[in-house]
Amino acid sequence: LENNETVSPSYFLRESGYFDEYSLSWSGNFNNRVFLGASVNIYDMKYQINSEYKENFSVVGGMSLKNYLSSSATGVGFRVGGIFIPADNIRIGASVQAPVIYTTKDINYADVYYNHGADNFGTIYTPEGDNNFKLQSPLVFNLSAALIQGKKGLIGIEYMNSSNNTAKFMNKNNNSFNYKYENDSIGAVFNAQHTVKLGGEYKVSNKFAIRAGYAYSTEPVKSRMQKEMNPNTNRTDLEYMVPSSTSYITGGIGYRDADWAFDFAVVNKMYDETFYAYNINKVADGFKMPTAVVSTTNLSFIATVSLRF
């Protein structure tokens, strides 16, 4: 850069993907007082990201760094739970989601374009990188209670704990030795996440009901995460986000018949994230790119049809 030359940075990001779950479930009723259930769940996930970080120089030229990442994973999980009815108007429940081991494959590549005058410009391409590994998700458990108000409605509360700080990376042989740095970092910067849900249902008729609820999840990472962020990777996508707490507002309807049932729900998920284009810990004051707060609202529609045999 020339003396007194300024830099104008900008950033572009596009994400896409899906997360599918397929379940095989069993449930049992014991004297109308104890209800038990279990399910085997198959997960299929894909995530893609295209990003570009650009710097335009005030005197001449500029540079850009483009990145592509595709991550795919499959896993099998197990969930078990139960409901106990100590009195006709009280329900107490608990469930456990065992850690899921995902078999994961990452593919990434990048290119850097530079322009510093008529005779000094070009593009440099990285070789395509791929990485195969396994990721073990945390243990998740739920506790719940519900109070039934006659034949017209109920109020329920639920607590969920996800021990995010116990997740870990492993190689294809389920050995985590080569990922000691990454796994130690997970334990240092991730929190055990707590979620509280409160909801209610009112029966308009014997078959039709309306529902509403609210949920709150604490921050999944510690506040000092940004200061301790030191990625150990040969990838060149340097951006990352530090998430805050999450709120959910829900509403829905349900219809119950003798042989079938239909449920429809709307979930509005809201959270903020602090965006960093790169790790600014070692950048001198006055040269750091400003952070940005990204506010996300995710509206989901869920429909379920159940058949009784």
Predicted regions and their residues:
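Outer-membrane beta-barrel porins/channels
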Residues: 1-309
